[in-house]
């Protein structure tokens, strides 16, 4: 395992009480594998990904568990070590909305360049420029040399997301965490971004932790799937097993809620996840 999360607990302490956003989550990610964490909004999947990089802000706090990465527990590292050795260098992250993740005051080239400055200070200015342009070309940005000098608001949504992927991949990290990277994109651009991520993975052997609520996306890219509900893992299985034989009632409810093609389904009411059912009362299904 390149990454092993054990009994992770991330709580938010508010005036209204304690919100156990992530409560005892465990899973492992193998080298060159794509693992999808799936669940409805509020299930704790994004908080899990932010916890791995220790990006939890107050009133949130990681209160327990361990995150083993290449033999070291990330929760035991000092903040300086996380900044210099882990974030961006060994573990890259693509956030959900590139327009809020990219700084509108700086060109996209400058922002990718900054990542190289921090993690590869041995590169000179010319080498960094060449590396950034190469990375923009690799993610399919046309006229990459010109786009280097563009500001984020001058690019399309698809191009901004490609810039985010370039920024996350420029240091060739061991793991790429993608938090709902295609949610704000149309179906065509979404397919292109997913294909791009698969290509980059095949070329570099990168492990991908993909956060999504879209089971259609999961079917396209996942090797392994972790299903989360209210801060807990309720089922884990290979993608093939999960879609062929879902065992936990919550997983079944998620799959049943997917709109189905065909005339016989056109007039049928779409199924929903029953909020009155306590899905945590059922045993976990870990295969």
Where are these regions (language model features)?
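Conserved ABC transporter NBD signature motif
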Residues: 62-73
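Conserved ABC ATPase "signature" region
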Residues: 73, 126-146, 255
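Short catalytic/signature loops enriched in Gly
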Residues: 142-145, 238-287
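A short, proline-enriched helix->beta-strand linker immediately N-terminal to the Walker B motif
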Residues: 170-174
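A short, surface-exposed alpha-helical micro-motif characterized by mixed small hydrophobic
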Residues: 218-220
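Short, glycine/charged-rich "phosphate-handling" switch motifs in NTP-dependent
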Residues: 224, 236
